[in-house]
């Protein structure tokens, strides 16, 4: 059997982390068995259809590297095929037209609830051979579900699941406007596309027996089902693709790596011993539906940040640097005005969790800052440090060999001569060169900023203290 899986999102909102997991599991299963992965866009909900969501889905999957072998197929382009099957089912007696009005159905529901019964369609139109109605009378088409027996399927994650047919409604498979419903379209799509394994969220479990019965009525082969548990956000609520902000595009914009996100997502329900870090090739080799937990998962941004930092520090420098360029451009930082980006990345990558953070924290290497941080200036740019800065300016100006080692020795020697701590002079230089008190090794910062810019910023700080002294004297 040639394995064939599918990812079938609805373009009605953002592609969120739960959707990404479904896509990843389906993709990995197909790749593990050297099968095919199909992309299908379920766009028959015309009222909520959002073309930007389609763009987001396609971009997100490409960014993650989840390439598809067929598609994208659009349900909206297959309407004639669905109607053809519905017509065939009407003729064979496996479906029927239901003329009950919305009011009739609501009255029926109220009566059932008042009697303590489970609301369901009574089947009043199920066996009608004719009815006096005007030509344009509205109707829906319902699937004639078996009224006895049971539906049993072996879920690859949850084991055997059984539903009694008497508990299942006669499903509407075509709306009154002539548009087929989701639960019908998905069955015909899976049938026509020869899908062998359906991997999806547990919220689809109740749809499965209805879909199986439709397939049986068509004498079709039943695919293998695997329903993964829900993912909850950090507040303990179910993710909503129309409410949660962190959709796939936001992860990308915020500087997360696709490798980190995939590694994070695969562990939301799947495990392989105590291993935490998985390359894409390892995921494809090790992925097994039997290792997916039945329990729900909860997102942890702390864990995702940790993984992202790991990949920033362990993937090839040239690869990370190339990705970082996009974030530098977004921050409008001109790379021509400063040091080699890979050198800056080497210095900063262990201090930050995302590419966006690295880009934002690297600005002082490429452009002058307008003002010193006020609290930092109040603490360090003070009259008693005036001489220290003038001495540093004089000594740095004399340097003929510009190297990290030379700068480090100069700073240490000044500490000895001036009888000040290395911490004090380092913090002072951080404020002078970056505008605040946070930076990597100060000698490395000076080296990358360069001699000319270092002297200019030292002069700026000296003048700042000069003005402060004048104000005190006045």
UniProtKB/Swiss-Prot annotation:
Subcellular location field: Cytoplasm
Enzyme Commission number: 6.1.1.17
Disulfide bond sites: none
Keywords: Aminoacyl-tRNA synthetase, ATP-binding, Cytoplasm, Ligase, Nucleotide-binding, Protein biosynthesis
GO molecular function, one term: ATP binding
A single Gene Ontology CC term: cytosol
Catalysed conversion reaction: tRNA(Glu) + L-glutamate + ATP = L-glutamyl-tRNA(Glu) + AMP + diphosphate
Segments carrying motif 'HIGH' region: 9-19
GO BP term (any one): glutamyl-tRNA aminoacylation
Residues noted as binding ATP in the record, renumbered to the chain: 241
Pfam families for this protein: Anticodon_2, tRNA-synt_1c
'KMSKS' region, short sequence motif: residues: 238-242
Domain of life assignment: Bacteria
Gene3D superfamilies per the UniProt record, alphabetical: 1.10.10.350, HUPs
Span of the signal peptide: none
Purpose: Catalyzes the attachment of glutamate to tRNA(Glu) in a two-step reaction: glutamate is first activated by ATP to form Glu-AMP and then transferred to the acceptor end of tRNA(Glu).
Matches recorded under PANTHER family: GLUTAMATE--TRNA LIGASE (PTHR43311), GLUTAMATE--TRNA LIGASE, MITOCHONDRIAL-RELATED (PTHR43311:SF2)
Similarity field: Belongs to the class-I aminoacyl-tRNA synthetase family. Glutamate--tRNA ligase type 1 subfamily.
Subunit structure: Monomer.
Protein name in the entry: Glutamate--tRNA ligase
Organism of origin: Buchnera aphidicola subsp. Schizaphis graminum (strain Sg)
Source organism phylogeny: Bacteria, Pseudomonadati, Pseudomonadota, Gammaproteobacteria, Enterobacterales
Name of encoding gene: gltX
